[in-house]
């Protein structure tokens, strides 16, 4: 493959063997595509806003004299961009404007005559917009809407696994689940009658719903049963003979052939052989004794032909008397139902006997009573209710997906249809349920991913929007029916509040709208790819059983089997697999390579879980020869969710890549295939908690997906178009675009502004720094600037540490970690955290709070870091307790004596009635103020600091825009100059003319003149753009801020806190190997090798065997080899060897092993080789893809190439004594992460503080400045030691004995070291609770 200039800077050696068929798709496409569909203006769309409007409009008045129709909609432009919204704490959204048409009909004239039409554009609230990285900014914070995995609409057949009834009988049920509307359930009871439930209310016999659908008893029996007829002749009875129906029965009489020979004797079981005989003889009728008819069930009503009186009703059981009556009435042929116990049960016939209703009206009344108990039913009410349940589009929506699943389950060819139910639908569901009860079909598996679908942002937002619209619809209907509409416009009818409220509620407080996890780029991407089974319309943690949480065979390639949280949510929150995507119906699908006649093609098909079951699919690692043909005769495959061996001709598909089954977080773990799944789960979860370090360090052992994640996460700056870097500084990169990528008539300059030191949601630091230099060529997609945790465009969450696996004086007991002082000195694990502290000045009842530097009872020294407005300077270094913003609050008037009042009135003295309520630095925090922002309410005068900040912002904007303008202007003049030079002008002539007149020269050539005019137009356009941009920015900066009611001013102070590594911090590798730092040891005491190189970290070898995460050992060995290669290159550079030698060595390194990667060093220029070698000095970055990584031989070969022992173990010496350790130790490089569980955030101590009001016990937790809980088990411990006084002290004066506490304080002050324990307050609480039960308890007074 050809590498771009940027990619040649550092090439990762890839150990992957399988060729890449498919690029990893854009990781955030699920979120972006879903929201795009929601917001896209497409009149044909059947989803999104368009569908929501079309489903609610037109709205007609109750009388039908007026109608409000929907025409179209469009989204306006957002008022502020994303950054401004974050700073101001507002929502990034755009106004929605809808064109509506009010049509008035003439009351007097014929129906449908239009009297008047009015069209108008109506504002319908703000819709939050998605940023380009798939997040939403709501009230200034970035949030993510997590997709939901819910049960797909459609029909499901299931059984209760024999749990409902004591007999253990399996009861089958069917459930029709719509997208919205009432659920319809059919179920069997232990007596095998069929019942129906609507919305899980009380059950009714299933025949009631059939009667309500206007089916008679005869029709019902006809639909569910086959019939057998009997012919009554004078002396004998003949029966219709269908041989197949006799299977398994016992002959009640001799069955004879045509000649009278006995085929089956009485009492014998009828076998398949007998049935074949009867079929060959082709007998249509057979003589039976009359008693044989007894117990059969009539299929029709039979009436006396003469009198018309009904003798036998349908579903009546035949008795000898009834047979005689029928025969007397002249009825010769009787049709009966065919039933048997095997596969034609009498279920519906029995159900009809339970059913008390006889006609449609009675059935409707019965349903009405069940749905609305206690209301008197009328015919109209009952009919309306029943029609609205399943047959009205407003109340019931099966949705396209639901209809597709419904038709597919019932085995229909056509998968489309109405989104409401029909008579046939209901009958077919009942037929299918009875088929399943008869053993002719299987029940469904509800955990199959073909029965669970994904609801993404767009769909959930659309549902909420529709909820708002329906509320509006009710109000509009009311208004259309009131008063005169002649002077009414559409705007007067619509109130946008309910819509805004519904949308706002969804984005602000829905369970699936979550505060974005922004620890590092990986955690952002993973959060956006998360799939949750919780949330509205989903499961709840408590009710979810083991089956739902389990890994299902259909998860393969769709949901990751590894990445899920530990704890109560395990298995309910999943992560999308690497290549997975959703199809048009919302089901997850995964790509497979097509195989034809045993050879693999490059065609890739995406299959959903339903389709996948029908194919035979081989693994990604199946053996292939050079032509792409399968080599093995028997191939391990997946078919119908089972693993089997198949011959190679039967194989139809194979996986596209080995890492297809895992999520991106799991595919970041090298040697994942050697780790136990539980540890891999911890590994993938802990990578998301890594804090970005001060200097990112790429992993020496990676998996090759690091670049994809870094680029797709959006934290890096990526070139939109190719070109040459023109200018670089810390906050901006300018690229001159290549001619061929330019749009005709544009300046051809791309300007990228970088983010500097901003705060993330988790208080980590977001900062971008350029990776390119002026003059370097860039191609589209190259990384121009690194963000947090990225290094040259690759994700870099931690640091490569030199580790040794050995015990060291008990300091690494039980997963503790011993680290070297050098790690702290070199700031390897130092992180920067940015905290935002707010000070709000409100308008109180007693007067306004004031931000000022004049604070009562505070010394000069405490105000040293504040300016005259009372706000801290930028750059001040502050510690816990320092004042950041001075603020005073008016105190309530104290009772004054008349003399004081007089003095006050004369001198206007007011100073004493304010109290200090300043913003102070929290305890234990010390850092540097890096930014201050002041927001002032409209109409409140800005203080000096606010004005200064405003001026600074304006100056910055002006400087930025001016520089931008200069760059673009330069580009314009360069193009004009080239045009003039190629049309007869020379350098001297151009130099003599003023630059501004270049654009007005006469060239005497029409084409060239047109080009020059176009350039001049562009120049004018750029100037105009500059003016409008500046004006817009100026207006935004100078206008007052929209603050919450009662707030006059907000000051935000940003503190940067630098945290070095220290004992108590949590470190982890990528294999679930986590630990806490026990101590930091001086470099000279650490174990070192022969050359005196000390190790950075000492880990306990006992942490490996029981955890079964051997991946960490392989990583250590490969890391050692990678570092050894780097050292060798460094030596060659130091010795200034010939560049050909360096080329040969690099070629040898990249060619090692059976890799798919082909790097041809001969294609590199000498400069490029030197730059590559320079970047490899610290170690050769390697990639060992998941399930396709480096094998033992390759690691050994690389170790050998680096002149290191192939065992991966070396001699170490004790740094304190200089003695050699007893045996060789495994030493190598492991990638270690610093997790966001820092001891500084957890360390906490209190002597006295706040107490709970009721129990008078200290509060708990660091945030409340609480005490330590002395719990039940701790009490036992003291009891066990018999430490009575200590225990008494713990339970009284140290806890909730109020008088004892104060007395204790006094005693300590008086140096009288005694204590008296009184009555604990919690005992009084207990007494009061018992009294509240009406039991009086009084303490004996002693």
Curated annotation (Swiss-Prot):
UniProtKB keywords: DNA-directed RNA polymerase, Nucleotidyltransferase, Transcription, Transferase
Sample GO molecular function, one term: ribonucleoside binding
Superkingdom assignment: Bacteria
One GO term of the biological process aspect: DNA-templated transcription
Function description: DNA-dependent RNA polymerase catalyzes the transcription of DNA into RNA using the four ribonucleoside triphosphates as substrates.
PANTHER family assigned to the protein according to its UniProt record, in alphabetical order: DNA-DIRECTED RNA POLYMERASE I SUBUNIT 2
Protein name: DNA-directed RNA polymerase subunit beta
